[in-house]
Amino acid sequence: RQGWTENTEPASQQEAYEMIGEAFDFSEKYQIPVLMRVTTRMAHSRAVVEIGEPRQQNTLHYPERPRQWILMPGNSRVRYKTLIEENKLFEQEAEHSRHNRYIDGPDKSMGIIACGLAYNYIMENFPEGCPFPVLKISQYPLPTALVQRMASECRSLLIVEEGQPLVEEMIRGLLGTPIPVKGRLSGELPRTGELTPDNVRGALGLPRRESEAASQLTMPRPPALCQGCGHRDVYTALNDVLREH
């Protein structure tokens, strides 16, 4: 939000793979960096993905406008104005992105805006199909036209997102207060910690599922440096010195 740049938030490993290639195209088209937000759950997962044909590497060349990459005060003021103007184009890209989908539903009492991986938690709770309209967002800036469409069709909105409630804050500012907007700020979802299918289930108004007790618990352990990391030897030496002194 502060960088005025393009941002993606994949909902699956396949989508993350596809977004990387599209991010390079977007970056070259608009001459800006593209960020990808990967949540902890996504980073600690793996899956088989379908890969595309390899592309030939671009020929290296000197940038046409080198000053735009040097953000000294004189350049940054001009660049900031340009980014504000280009942000309208970025929003149009998000409106038509295949990664942002509006899925209609018969029950208009609530519309659900699910960001990135949170979309999976919604669908996991509705294996037969969600009865509420769902707006899946995985490419930013916020597709405001899609949000306004949902707000005009539904009597309330539930924002399901990981981390800070940035989208919830933006939607509250965008809509004002014509309809209730629920999420982490309003208490329907926990303010801190990762989302899970179970706490999302509560926000959807569904009864809590009975779960079986775990057969055994994994004992907690402090974080460790990865095997093969060169820093392990340094810390081993430091611990040896500390024991001696």
What are the functions of these language-model segments?
Residues L242-H245:
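Short, intrinsically disordered, charge-balanced linker/junction segments flanking boundaries
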Residues R1:
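Conserved PLP-enzyme active-site core in the AAT-like
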Residues P10-L225, G230-H231:
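Flexible, low-complexity linker and terminal segments
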